[in-house]
Amino acid sequence: MKEKRLIIKRSGYPSKGEIVIGTVKRVLDFGAFVSLDEYEGREGMVHISEVASGWIKDIREHVKKGQKVICKVLDVNPKRGHIDLSIKDVNERQRREKLQQWKNEMKAFKWLEIIGEKLNIDFKELEKIGKKLMKEYDSVYSAFEEAAFEGYEVLAPIVGEEFAKEMAEIARENIKPKRVKVRGYFELKSSASDGIERIKKALLEAKKALVNGVEMKLEYVGAPKYRIVVEADDYKTAENVLKKATENVLKAIKKLGGEGNFIREAA
């Protein structure tokens, strides 16, 4: 017998343009019907023209019953209960992000189960708690993130102090702070006989900008380019370190008789 798992679904309908995850329930010649995993009792339809780009000879070569699919909501008609979906309109970045979001949410549901077992709370009550968290934070995982970084106190008014403390404990054990990266590259030149050594010396000045909790990588791209990558807990810190590192390097190369400039790369 399959073990029952806690799955908390949203009521209502998805919004037009929303990226959703679903399970293919039926595949017909003209399209596929998809059960929306995040919504209670909602099913959408992917017309054959929205399955993939180009002409499709056999839809079953692209989608199969039981398959997980990431879709974009094209249109919603609550009166008729219709939800039009597209698979082809979802790009690779959206697909990856949605899958990760879903995996995170499934983990969060499991964490609620663990707390429920510890505090002797049944699935029905856990579902109510989960829906409260979804209403406040949009997802249960986001609520756990809040507990990890802000403390149990922020959740206590929603789920009670005892439950909030358990959430914070699990969150701190399992959720690590997200790191951010900023990058760019130097173009450094020196016509001196020991020009390469002078450039290396100038680049080492970048490390003097480092502060606690920040990491920096310097990479040779190809003369005269040298990439710098700064990683920190937040963009403000990363930007400040990158700015200081840039100033240090450009000042040093000039002092050593060379020339240089810095070009910022998009995040």
Curated annotation (Swiss-Prot):
For this chain, one GO molecular function annotation is:
ribosome binding
Q: Which UniProt keywords apply?
A: Initiation factor, Protein biosynthesis, RNA-binding
Q: Where is the S1 motif domain?
A: 17-88
InterPro entries annotated for this entry? NA-bd_OB-fold, S1_domain, S1_IF2_alpha, TIF2_asu_arc, TIF2_asu_C, TIF2_asu_middle_sf, TIF_2_asu
Q: Which domain of life is it from?
A: Archaea
- Stated role: eIF-2 functions in the early steps of protein synthesis by forming a ternary complex with GTP and initiator tRNA.
- Which family does this protein fall into? Belongs to the eIF-2-alpha family.
Complex formation? Heterotrimer composed of an alpha, a beta and a gamma chain.
Q: Which HAMAP family match?
A: eIF_2_alpha
The protein depicted here goes by the name: Translation initiation factor 2 subunit alpha
Ranked from the top, the taxonomy reads: Archaea, Methanobacteriati, Methanobacteriota, Archaeoglobi, Archaeoglobales
